[in-house]
Amino acid sequence: NNFTIYDADDQKTLMKEICRKMNIDTKKVRERALLAQISHAKDELLNPDEMEVNAGADFNQKRAAQVYREYQAALRRNNALDFDDLIVKTVELFQNCDDVLQTYQERFRYIMVDEYQDTNTAQFKFVSLLASRYENLCVVGDDDQSIYKFRGANIGNILGFERVFPNAKVIRLEQNYRSTQNILDAANGVIANNTERKEKTLWTENPEGEKIHFRQFMNGYEEAEYVVGDIAKRHREGMADYHDCAVLYRTNAQSRLFEEKCLHANIPYKIVGGVNFYARKEIKDLLCYLKTVDNAADDLAVRRILNVPKRGIGATTVGRVQDYADMMNISFYDALR
């Protein structure tokens, strides 16, 4: 059967409906927070029942497990999967159907995995099952760069790789081609404090380069004021042109303070990057039309395009159709018919 893959916006819309039905106040418990708990459970290959057992007396975890159960039921009704399900369902298929597993083991005899330090438990299980027959597995990763535990990454996957695959050959790539030695020395000094890591020392044939300057600030406002002030000073004293300066930041939200300070100081700037193509409204609308054609049971897609372009259909009418669909236990599309 055809099925729809829900992206982050689809998941949030679905979770909002579930919270409404379960009388959960989304001002106190955010949809994103519940989805993150569910995603973490799927990363660990836990179903709703297992998550509830693990919750013990933790009220928040128990509630998340109950929401998880309703969330999965809603996905089934809509004939949809989320991104985590693509791995989880494949692992379940491989574990329960040996013939299917063998088919794909024959198809993919040689497997390569990049950024292995960022893999979660479900991904590790998936790769282990697929590679278990021929063990032609090459993974590339750096345990020192494992920073995504909050997203479910399990550093044990790379630290314990030789234990799971005892015949593996480990090749350390310690020469760096991008950075100066001063930058590498600083990095080596910081990461040496980590007691659970694979020993390695980065080095380069590049020049030593300039010394690193470290500044620490109480908040983002102080940081932006200092950085923009330093750029203005360098330009004023003829040390650098504006186009010689770049500010790197991890999240888009951080750019606002720097932009405000640049505007205040009359410093021209350019933001590199923009809205993701598939996150644009018109693209999502078009994709939902295609989803509806392919899978009319996808309520989220049907409701999104119902009034695109505008047809004078209000929220009250949509609500009545949804109530009828819920009462008759049919899809939103069938209720419209």
Sequence positions of predicted segments:
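Short alpha-helix plus adjacent loop in nuclease-associated cores
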Residues: 1, 144-151, 178-179, 271-294, ...
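Conserved P-loop NTPase-based nucleic-acid remodeling module centered on helicase motor cores
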Residues: 1-37, 42, 46-55, 66, ...
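Residue-level signature of catalytic and energy-coupling elements of molecular machines
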Residues: 15, 38, 82, 114, ...
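Proline-centered turn/helix-capping motifs that create local helix->coil transitions or kinks
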Residues: 26-27, 42-48, 190-201, 326-333
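Short, well-structured alpha-helical segments
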Residues: 28-39, 61, 65, 84, ...
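Conserved helicase C-terminal RecA-like lobe
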Residues: 53, 57, 255-267, 280, ...
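Conserved helicase NTPase motor core
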Residues: 57-160, 173-179
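Helicase P-loop NTPase motor core
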Residues: 166-169, 174-268, 291-295, 327
